[in-house]
Amino acid sequence: MSSDQEMAIFGEAAPYLRKSEKERIEAQNRPFDAKTSVFVAEPKESFVKGTVQSREGGKVTVKTEAGATLTVKEDQVFPMNPPKYDKIEDMAMMTHLHEPAVLYNLKERYAAWMIYTYSGLFCVTVNPYKWLPVYNAEVVTAYRGKKRQEAPPHIFSISDNAYQFMLTDRENQSILITGESGAGKTVNTKRVIQYFATIAVTGDKKKEEVTSGKIQGTLEDQIISANPLLEAFGNAKTVRNDNSSRFGKFIRIHFGTTGKLASADIETYLLEKSRVTFQLKAERSYHIFYQIMSNKKPDLIEMLLITTNPYDYAFVSQGEITVPSIDDQEELIATDSAIDILGFTSDERVSIYKLTGAVMHYGNMKFKQKQREEQAEPDGTEVADKAAYLQSLNSADLLKALCYPRVKVGNEFVTKGQTVQQVYNAVGALAKAVYEKMFLWMVTRINQQLDTKQPRQYFIGVLDIAGFEIFDFNSLEQLCINFTNEKLQQFFNHHMFVLEQEEYKKEGIEWEFIDFGMDLAACIELIEKPMGIFSILEEECMFPKATDTSFKNKLYEQHLGKSNNFQKPKPAKGKVEAHFSLIHYAGTVDYNIGGWLDKNKDPLNETVVGLYQKSAMKTLANLFSGATAAEAEAGGGKKGGKKKGSSFQTVSALFRENLNKLMTNLRSTHPHFVRCIIPNETKTPGAMEHELVLHQLRCNGVLEGIRICRKGFPSRILYADFKQRYKVLNASAIPEGQFIDSKKASEKLLGSIDVDHTQYKFGHTKVFFKAGLLGLLEEMRDDKLAQLITRTQARCRGFLARVEYQKMVERRESIFCIQYNIRAFMNVKHWPWMKLYFKIKPLLKSAETEKEMANMKEEFEKTKESLAKAEAKRKELEEKMVALMQEKNDLQLQVQAEADSLADAEERCDQLIKTKIQLEAKIKEVTERAEDEEEINAELTAKKRKLEDECSELKKDIDDLELTLAKVEKEKHATENKVKNLTEEMAGLDETIAKLTKEKKALQEAHQQTLDDLQAEEDKVNTLTKAKIKLEQQVDDLEGSLEQEKKIRMDLERAKRKLEGDLKLAQESTMDIENDKQQLDEKLKKKEFEMSNLQSKIEDEQALAMQLQKKIKELQARIEELEEEIEAERASRAKAEKQRSDLSRELEEISERLEEAGGATSAQIEMNKKREAEFQKMRRDLEEATLQHEATAATLRKKHADSVAELGEQIDNLQRVKQKLEKEKSEMKMEIDDLASNMETVSKAKGNLEKMCRTLEDQVSELKTKEEEQQRLINDLTAQRARLQTESGEYSRQLDEKDSLVSQLSRGKLAFTQQIEELKRQLEEEIKAKSALAHALQSARHDCDLLREQYEEEQEGKAELQRAMSKANSEVAQWRTKYETDAIQRTEELEEAKKKLAQRLQDAEEHVEAVNAKCASLEKTKQRLQNEVEDLMIDVERTNAACAALDKKQRNFDKILAEWKQKYEETHAELEASQKESRSLSTELFKIKNAYEESLDQLETLKRENKNLQQEISDLTEQIAEGGKRIHELEKIKKQVEQEKTELQAALEEAEASLEHEEGKILRIQLELNQVKSEIDRKIAEKDEEIDQLKRNHIRVVESMQSTLDAEIRSRNDAIRLKKKMEGDLNEMEIQLNHANRMAAEALRNYRNTQGILKDTQIHLDDALRGQEDLKEQLAMVERRANLLQAEIEELRATLEQTERSRKIAEQELLDASERVQLLHTQNTSLINTKKKLETDISQIQGEMEDIIQEARNAEEKAKKAITDAAMMAEELKKEQDTSAHLERMKKNMEQTVKDLQHRLDEAEQLALKGGKKQIQKLEARVRELEGEVESEQKHNIETVKSLRKHERRVKELTYQTEEDRKNVLRLQDLVDKLQAKVKAYKRQAEEAEEQSNVNLSKFRKLQHELEEAEERADIAESQVNKLRVKSREVHTKIISEE
């Protein structure tokens, strides 16, 4: 016991952990009468304290503490322990150990709130139902590193012991916290996790990851936070517990090599999902529902569309809605915080809450029945709308899927009607499935977060699983939970009791086996063994017409009255009906089987599951992502068949699989047990119900554990350790200087000590002590050490006293001497001579003293100086030391940094290598593109030079034309009289303008549509341009950094190679040493184990020999009598065998017919029913025959037993039999050696199989990786194809200048959209085909697993057969007869052998464990061997059946193999044809692509010409505006407007002609496109058909993959050659793909240039349209002005006539003549002004000609790609030159005419002065003639311009044609790329199929070889059996002859 000072470290928890010293002293001093103080049995309280009053006649009268007097029997009175044992911490230490002592010890400790108590090797805890301060941080610190006996009992002590064991023993640990529901298991689990998270912190923070803006917690925080989240979604209130875990969890906490936390993971078991939709009255659903509705977070209420009243929701309000001990609001905050700490994203958090809310809404969905129909229909859609909204589904689709689900019938899907109840059941199933899958997904996410990827070595597992449950209504969930607790209790018993006693047996300790009455095998076998409850349940689930009633009848038929643990319950009033009862270790439970079949199959509405998979909520879609495929394969089961092939896996099978995994994990660890106890049913703190606690103590094995500790030997020490430690007790017993064995020394030592010699035993390696004896030895050792130390101290004290005494004697003598001298001095000090001496003496020594002082001063100075120097030197050295230490630290930091930088550099080096490879590929691509661009540039340069030469010639011609035009313009003044004609023509122009206005509106609408499309494309182009610029910058940066990194990389590589070499050498040496060490350790352990086994077997067989000597003679005497009975039995057996074979044959025929007819019509189903009835009848007949044979065998066995009893004393030939037995013993030893070697062979084979399994798993992962890469490649190609198609559509839309073109291209776009949909459908089909391939691969793996399991079972069966046959001897024939008869009864089990192979493997393992535990005596050995013979005979038959099945399967494989080979050759031929066609298409694509590029250039030229035309229109508009400003020169302006109008009309006519031509061309191109498209579609369809055929072939190939065994090796060489050829083709296609990528990039650049040009063109088009509007307004204004001028002209004409008359009247008058001269002078001045204006116009026209020259230069650029038209253009140029020469001649004539006109004008002026009227009229006539000539010349010029424009249009047509050709090239290139991608994908699939077939081939051959070996061993075993029979007969005949 610790003192109060030692307990002070526990702080305020100390009073709750251990009694104080004062209480312990008071307890020891309390009066106590051991004779009268007792516990007495009492009906109400079970046991009470009392005092014995009297004892008479076996009766005891006891007075209780309450004052009552009881008279009971002696066995109902139990003595009390002394007061010092009150509240003892380890109940195994009590003097009197019985039920009342344990009960009251727990009760008294519980009353003092000490809730933890040790009970032998485990800990008992009682639920306090209140908070106690025993889990604080200071308590954790106090328990850290403490041994169990050094600290009070506590869960922290158990945890620390497990932690220390893990570190010291290097073994995984587990803590099993078990008990009934409500006992406190979950709380203790949390405390264990809290302890580990505190003591094993990593010391540094986990990397903080930012997820959705939130920072995650450390690993310790996350481990602790996992509990609140799991409790919110997995805990609920039950009748016995407010916070009951409705799921089991096994938490593994992983630790690193230093003992620090590394990671954690959680495995969950058996979530009670039925609680989501149903609760009892006193219970409630999971906490999360009520937390959300607590209104702590109103935003959740709003988001989930719910209220705060739980009664509004049917699923969560069937029981209670509040729990007093739980604050739902605070718990919601804790849950939300845990979600943050565990790193869930915001989307995941919202999804969790939304799915939870959707489950609540599901419960409120209402449905009703249609009138006059059974069909259900929704009763309102509001709730469904909310649920669908929360799950991102369509409400109408959800309701339709619920009411009208689609089910698969054969190969088709049909719509099925649902009744109202069926719909409600489906809704409930969906709600439970969503909640369960969400819970499992959360656990997976938590595990991902807790997996830190740190190195981990060992783990400590904490098991917290639902406790034993007994409710009013117990269903399948309760059976699973109780069965789990039953298995755990069995594990506890096995570990605590059986292993303990096996240890004694192994050590040779004599030990009486204790029967604890806790053998749970009967109940467990009733549930899980073949024909058990689970087996019958799964069998019923396979029959479509099975019901709960048929299930109950089968249970009754199989178990009622045959198993003591299975009973029929008694009906109870007021309770739900129960169908059967099971007697568990904790009590009898009544089970209701209602709905068990549906629960076990767990069906879901597949239509709704399909909606879930397509949900926009990613979390929901992920939860059900694999449901459809799994269910389709599983045949409607909950999970896809993992190990059962095509059969579905039920809930019970999945549960048993998980339970077996859990038990396997537990068996691989060192367990620590914690037992939780419920003190009372009312949850009252401090109260304890005696009967309840006693029941738990009995059922939990607590009392039995204490008893075995007391009766056993819990303390054990190795002999060497015992000798070393306790030699001090009697050193004389072990002689010094003489070697003596440690065991003998320990025996002598214990024999010489005064202890009870019955309290210890000597084993082979250890000495064993009963409880308490080791403590006594420790006390004796302490006493002995105290004596020795006392003696040592006495001698030391004596020695010190003698030393001190000697010193005292010496001091006394010194004092005597001093006293004598002082007395003498006192006598002589007054003498005169003495006084003189005193005066002179100092003077004599003063000189010497002065010298000495001077010397001393000098020495002092020197010493001082040296001291200063030393001090300075010391300081200097200290400074140096500090500097060196700092430098050392810096160097250490530098070394660490360099190590880190080296690691980083290595990572960067790897990344740079990858980057370098990528950049080299990019550089290579860029280099190739640059070379192509250089070639193109050189070609363009040559063309440019040639065109420049041609341009210079054209410039000369244009200069001549300019001179001619300048001269022509000078003649404009002669055209003034054409104003009238212009006025008439303007009316026609108005009509034309009106038409153009209408056309303009139509163009504006089309233009607006084009602008919208153009804007979208510009945005895309801008984005791509930015991305391109950014990528180019990145490439430049990477190229710059690459050079720097190369240098660093070279240095790092040299260092890395050196380090890698050193590391490799060190690792190899380390691995060699470790391997040698492990091998030696394993050999040593194995030898020790074999030695101990052989020793025990020798002893057993010695006893066996003695008994066999007695029994053999009895058996041999009885053999003769039994042989006669055997002959009769053989006759009956032959008859039964014949019947069995007939029935088996009929049964096989019926089974084959049933399998062939499975999925047939109703008539076939009826026939199956009849056959099943016949089968049942045959089975009953068979069972009756079996019962008869069993009765006969029982009679024989009874007779045999009687004869054995009668002949028991007839023993005479004992010695001869003994010699024979010794000989047989030696033979058995040899057989044991053979069996050991066989076991080693089996273990090696098992290891090889495990390696093979791992290799297959690696191959599967590689296949998955390849499949993902193929999928990514397909996605990239699809995206590229879609992008190119989009660009093609955009190019088409850019040419939409008219409404009609827009409609046509829209139809083209629709066609492209349909084509894209078709391609998507094709892609989906390919994906489905790949998924089918994956499923086929998975099924192949399943078949492989089944074969491997069959092989392992066969191996085990053979080994067990050999062991059994070596010991069965003469009884084999009799037992074989019995078990062959039993085999008839198990025909049905043989039919289900494939399904139950995995279960039999587990049974075999448990059987091996049972065999090892039951070798105590000969009778048990004989019984065990008989059981093994029985099982092995069944296994032999099953093995033969399996062999036959394998032979049949082999023949099928051979057939399928031949089919595959033929299909493979066909596929290869088709693949070569496809490759040839692909190459030809690629060549065509390249040609078309070149033509397409030329077309793009022509399109660019066309756009520039359009721009120039718009510029010309703009210039003309400006000229018209200038003409409007000169009203006073109306005639000249009219002439100019007429000319401009003519030009505009010509331009408009030309535009109309061009437009009509363009429309015709577009229609023609559209037709060509349609033709090309139809051709491509046809080719695509052909390729699709080929691809579909290939896919079908490949699907058949994959389905028959198991058949590609022997033929694949022969075709491997051909496949390798084909692979090389395909790789060459692949390289060619990759080159073509790179070229196509370059062409695509160039097309993208051209597209961007075209977009820029189109944008400029659009701007100019807008300006032209605005100018056209202005022109229209100006024309109207000019028309009005022309009318005014016409009126003025008429007035002038009238005035002229009047003047003429006046001139005739006053001709002689001078004044009139003078006025006339003045008028002529004015006219002359006007003509001079007109001349100047014409000169100005000529200068303007010259400027326009300069613009024309610029346009000609632009035309040079346009002619880059039109070299083919050069000849035509040259001819046209020649014609133009002729025209120009003609115009030159005309120009000269005109100049001459102008001179003549000038001369005539002068003469006219002179004549005008003279008044020559006739001359003026002649001049006017001449002017008209000249104007006519000028007009004809203008017309000729206009025709010339039209001809030139026609040629330009021809050039544009050629450009456009080239562009269209280039587009076609791109389309064909896309098609070729897609076909190449498909060819590559199928090539990879073929390679993968080949690899898989090779793997399967090797596996099959290996299995076949192993099967042959097994058959050989079986033959050997049969031969041994025959030998044994012969030997038995010989022995029998010898005995008879001797008698």
Curated annotation (Swiss-Prot):
Modified residues (N6,N6,N6-trimethyllysine): K130
Ligand binding (ATP): G179, E180, S181, G182, A183, G184, K185, T186
Pfam families to which the protein is assigned, alphabetical: Myosin_head, Myosin_N, Myosin_tail_1
Nucleotide-binding as UniProt keyword: yes
Residue intervals of the Myosin N-terminal SH3-like domain: 33-82
Domain Myosin motor: residue ranges: 86-782
IQ domain residues: 785-814
UniProt-recorded Gene Ontology molecular function terms: actin filament binding; ATP binding; calmodulin binding; microfilament motor activity
Chain segments annotated as coiled-coil in the UniProt record: 843-1939
Positions of post-translational Pros-methylhistidine modification: H757
Region span, Actin-binding: 659-681, 761-775
Listed GO CC annotations: cytoplasm; myofibril; myosin filament; myosin II complex
UniProt KW keywords: Actin-binding, ATP-binding, Calmodulin-binding, Coiled coil, Cytoplasm, Hearing, Methylation, Motor protein, Muscle protein, Myosin, Nucleotide-binding, Phosphoprotein, Thick filament
Binding partners and assembly: Muscle myosin is a hexameric protein that consists of 2 heavy chain subunits (MHC), 2 alkali light chain subunits (MLC) and 2 regulatory light chain subunits (MLC-2). Interacts with SLC26A5.
Protein name per its UniProtKB record: Myosin-1
Native organism: Canis lupus familiaris (Dog)
